[in-house]
Every structure is written in C-alpha cells, then in structure tokens.
C-alpha cells in the first residue's frame, strides 16, 4: 500500500441515501444552509479545520496561543533556560539526594527544586522559526502519557510543558495513564491536581499492564485524530507540535518523531543542539542505535526543515494518525513491559507501506535515567517476537548473536503473521535494500563465527565488555569464563 491510502480504506461504508422527495428536501435544506453560511461568515471552528489550506492570516499569533501561558521568566531560577544545576548540600541533604537517585535513577531531589514551568533554550534550526502553518487545516491530537510510580515533579513538568507549548486549537487532550502505581502521591493528590487543569484527564489500569498495553489503554479513549505518545519525563520545546501534525496532514501514512534532546538525569541540563538530527538504526542483536543521516537522505531533502526518513525509532515519542495506527494493528499486545516494541513497530511501518520520519523542527527533551529503574526481563521475548514475524530468514543473524534467544518463550504470534499477510507487507530483504542499505549484512558462514576459546586456560573465552555503552569501540578484550550465550563473547573472522 505504497503512497497515500485512499479515503475508502479509512472510513466505513456510507449509509444508503434517502430517495424521492426526501432527497429533494435534503438538497434544498443543504442549499439554504450553504446560503446562510455564505451570508453570515465562516462556519464553526471544527468545520473550518477540515477546509482546504488557507494562506496565513493576521491572527496566526492568536491561533498559536497555548492552553496556558508560561509564568514570567525568572533568569535567576534554578535550571531556567535549561542550565545545569549543581547544589551545595549538607550531609543530610546529600543522603536524601542519593536516595532519590537510587529510587528513580533520576536526581529527583534536584528536580523538585526546579520550576514545573521552566523555559528551555532554543535548539531548533533557525529556519524552523520562519515556518508558517494553517492552524485551521491541522488535525487535533490527543497526547498519551503512560506512567508507573513516576516522581511528582518530572511527571507534572511533562504535563505543564505540553500545556504551555501546544496551541490550544490543536491540543484535544492530555491522557495520563496510570499503570497501576502504588505511590501515595499518585492517588488522590494527583486526581485533585489534574482536576484543576484544562484538557487533562487521568485514567487508571486495573492491574500492571506494562508500557505497550498502558499506551493502548490511553489510545482506546482518545478523541483526537492524531495520537501523540510521550514518556513521563519530558519537556517540550517551543513549536514542537505543529511540525508533527502538519506532516501527517500531508501524508496520512507518515509516523513522525520529534528530535529527542537529552536532559541530564543528574543536573537537568538541556543538551539539545540545532545541528543535523541523527536517525535510528539497529544492529543484528536487535539493539537500537543512533546514526548520522546518510548522504542519500540528505540529497532527497529539499530543505533543512524537511522531515528525515529513519529506519527505526527510539519508541518513546512519536505522532501517528489514530486511524492509521489502528489500520497497522496498533501495538503488539503480546509484548510485555517495554523493550523491542520500537523496532517491531518500525519494521511494520516500513514493510506495510508507511514511512517513519524525524522532523528537525520538532524538539522534545527527554530525561534518560542513569539506568532502567524497572526490570527489562521481558525485552528479549519482545525482540524474538519482532524477529519471528518480520525478519524472515534474516532472523538467523539475530539468533547467531543471541543463542539463548532460541530458547526464550515468546508466546503466540499467529495473529501478527496473519496481520502481515492481510496488509500485504513487503519482506525484510526489501527493508534492508530500500530503507536501511547502510546496514551491513554479514555472511555468518559456519566456521567463521563463534566463541574464541583459550586452549591454555580451560573454559575461558575472549570477552569484550565495554565499560561505557556510548563508546563501544577501542576498549580492551579480556579473558572470562565461557558462558555460551554469544553476545560479548561472539567473534567473527
């Protein structure tokens, strides 16, 4: 289903029309209504939003107004304009700070002292400020934020950031999905707080669902034409929403991600930059990776403000047409908690006729925790599901690098395979050749890969375990007891 889907594929069958005199009467009423609208001015806002694009009007500044205005700038406030904060603490205060980091893997002690409404430095390309939008023609979005035992300040800073940077005319609602939290501050206290905010509603899961199903719970009650998923510790840059919605208005099968800027977990410094965004990729262990934009994609784009095609997404932040999300089969509900769902959805988007893009004019800051605060034990099974459904014979390259994955229970994928057949999706070879030609496909011939065993020391193998996950090359190879799991003991010659 390459290109734009026909409207007949999106909406159900039309009801039968009236006949005879009823038809004439209906036509007459419609004509009269059209005359009244022509005589008495433009139609209501919702109808006008479905009209063809119009030239920017003088009231565009009015249309850009967010749901809430930010408080006046306080240049001396902690963390204002994304500045790093380092507190001088007493021993007792330092212990409380360390406890907050241990519990959340984020410096919540500091976060609680930074305004929920802080302003961010400008981090987009200068040309992005010049872009004009026809706000009446853009669709509305529901922003879905799932959380589990999230700290108060990071969760509420996310909510206020959306409310204070999103045009009122474009934000249908924020849906907070509580994935069965047990912290007291997320119960009645949160309910009372949210009750005082426009366009924010809180729904609760009846049991622990995990990120995938919690997001689907939010999507199931969303009223907006577009679903925008955000993590629960984000801050939105000025003008972040319009580019996402405008691109989907142009192409309904585009799934669009913002540029993800890093917010330091310890100092809350906003580390985004206005340079060329990186795109998502993966390696044959099915680990998500970042890469520079390839030359072929740079040549395809006509402007620095055009969206960038990306083979994969990080997964936490993106916008998608609600109808197209449903058409694609939404999330794989057989996946647990989080991990691997981003690659599975990325493969499905591309192989089933859509496109996955990153928009350089949309920036959202994200606090990357010191380490994952909750277990990712189910991530392996999620990756196996992705490999089994979408990777065809190339799944063997994954299994060679993760031998233990062959033994991992991954549930029933019959429905997902039937979905692939129903949507007439392309094979993984097409994906590699057309979407991600930069990814090297190894031969993996027998005898050319495996573990290198030391013959002088019984049961010891070459082991490569970088101490810094962001710098995986140029580090020392050591000897370590052979574990038979591949991964950091897998060698190729």
Regions found by a protein language model. Name each.
Residues 227:
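Short aromatic/hydrophobic "clamp" motif used to bind/position activated sugar donors
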Residues 188, 205-222:
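Glycine-rich, basic loop-to-helix element that forms the pyrophosphate-binding segment
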Residues 212, 287-319, 327:
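A recurrent flexible, glycine/aromatic-enriched loop bordering the glycosyltransferase active site
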Residues 163-204:
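Acidic donor-binding segment of Leloir-type glycosyltransferases
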Residues 139-144, 173, 344:
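Cell-envelope/extracellular polymer assembly enzymes that use nucleotide-activated donors
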Residues 235, 239-291, 355:
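Conserved donor NDP-sugar-binding/catalytic core segment of glycosyltransferases
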Residues 434-493:
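Lectin-like carbohydrate-binding module/patch detector with strong preference for beta-trefoil
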Residues 2-56:
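N-terminal signal-anchor transmembrane helix specifying type II single-pass membrane topology
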